[in-house]
Design a protein with these regions (language model features):
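Conserved HGGG/HGGXW glycine-rich cap/lid loop of the alpha/beta-hydrolase fold
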Residues: 65-110
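Catalytic active-site module of serine/aspartate enzymes centered on a nucleophile-bearing elbow/loop
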Residues: 277-307
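Short beta-strand/loop motif that positions the catalytic acidic residue
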Residues: 247, 253-255, 259
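Flexible "cap/lid" loop of the alpha/beta hydrolase fold
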Residues: 150-158, 163-194
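An N-terminal hydrophobic leader/cap segment in hydrolases
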Residues: 17-52
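Active-site loop/oxyanion-hole signature of alpha/beta-hydrolase fold enzymes
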Residues: 53-58, 63, 95, 101-143
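Conserved alpha/beta-hydrolase catalytic His-Asp/Glu region
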Residues: 29-34, 184-248
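Conserved alpha/beta-hydrolase "acid-adjacent" motif
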Residues: 260-266
Length: 307
């Protein structure tokens, strides 16, 4: 009897060891997948809803949190991003009583990636409006980060009756020729990934080689979408310089003082173009300020949204 029990325990221990080894090998080969799985688990454990809706015949994924009957905020991510990019900021708004919707733009995250779509900011703005229509959101407080800010500007300009307040986080949209290599948003080598991180963060940490490889692999799967979006933006046909002064709703401009993608001077230009805008600068923060500097930013965003 004891011999049988020992054999059973040995078999169980061996199974555990094998599972740990397989899991460890999986993590080394696909760390991005493990990180995504952790994020999805975090969403489930914190009551964040993950849903899809049909917009113009496409499946658009979105996250939602906060009380169902609360005032609505829609947050739009940037180039190469997804709904999870708002994971640090959205809880501030949700805890303050807002219903926060975070769509994955077409071609990003868990939304469809149709080959025939242009992925221009103008057409993505149409997807955002279609998303609002599909959910029956007549008027929202709209926020956008980086390229998502440009998209939010277009929505606010073309549909001002749908936007009660506008929040722009390190936003694109002005006619400015970048002084950095736009190909870095689709890195193919660890060195290029390092260059991208220097642009995104004031003090980037070294990325382990196995993580860098998987990040490059993951970006590569949707790299054609990013390239198409960048090519469209570089034409400058959808810039908003001449239209921003037309905005009448309250506007909050949020910027990291160390943003190397869109330097602080662009925030100041945007502030001048929108007379009623409020500019909040966060010292020491870079282009990823909504993700990395949320402790300082969150309360100010909530205060603006509540006014």
């Amino acid at each position: 009897m004891r011999t049988a029990k020992r054999a059973l325990w040995r078999a169980a221990a061996l199974a555990v060891v094998l599972l740990v080894m397989i899991g460890g090998m999986g993590f080394l080969l696909r760390p991005v997948s493990y990180f995504n799985a952790w994020m999805y688990l975090h969403e489930d454990l914190n009551g964040i809803e993950s849903r899809t809706v049909q917009v113009e015949g496409y499946r658009v994924h979105y996250l939602a949190e906060g009380p169902v009957n609360g005032p609505v905020v829609v947050l739009v991510h940037g180039l190469g991003g997804n709904a999870e990019d708002w994971r640090n900021l959205a809880p501030y708004l949700a805890k303050a009583g807002f219903r926060v919707y975070m769509p994955d733009l077409l071609g990003y995250g868990r939304s469809d990636m149709p080959a025939a779509f242009s992925y221009s900011v103008c057409d993505e703005a149409g997807i955002v409006v279609g998303f609002m229509n599909a959910l029956g959101l007549k008027q929202v407080e709209l926020g956008g980060w980086s390229m998502g800010g440009w998209i939010a500007e277009i929505v606010a300009v073309e549909h001002p009756e749908r936007v009660s307040r506008l929040m722009l986080f390190d936003a694109a949209g002005l006619e400015v020729k970048p002084d950095w290599n736009t190909n870095l948003f689709t890195p193919t080598t660890p060195a290029q990934l390092d260059e991208l991180n220097v642009l995104l963060m004031p003090h980037p940490q070294p990325v382990p080689a196995f993580v860098a490889r998987d990040i490059i692999r993951t970006i590569g799967k949707g790299g054609w979408v990013i390239k198409r979006a960048v090519a469209s933006m570089l034409t400058a046909r959808d810039v908003t310089d001449s239209e921003l002064p037309e905005l009448k709703m309250p506007v909050l401009i949020v910027w990291g003082s160390q943003d190397r993608i869109f330097p602080l001077a662009q925030a100041e230009t945007m502030h001048r173009l929108i007379p009623q805008s409020q500019l909040e600068i966060f010292p020491g923060c870079g282009h990823l300020a909504p993700l990395e500097c949320t402790c300082a930013m969150g309360p100010k965003v909530v205060k603006f949204a509540q006014q």
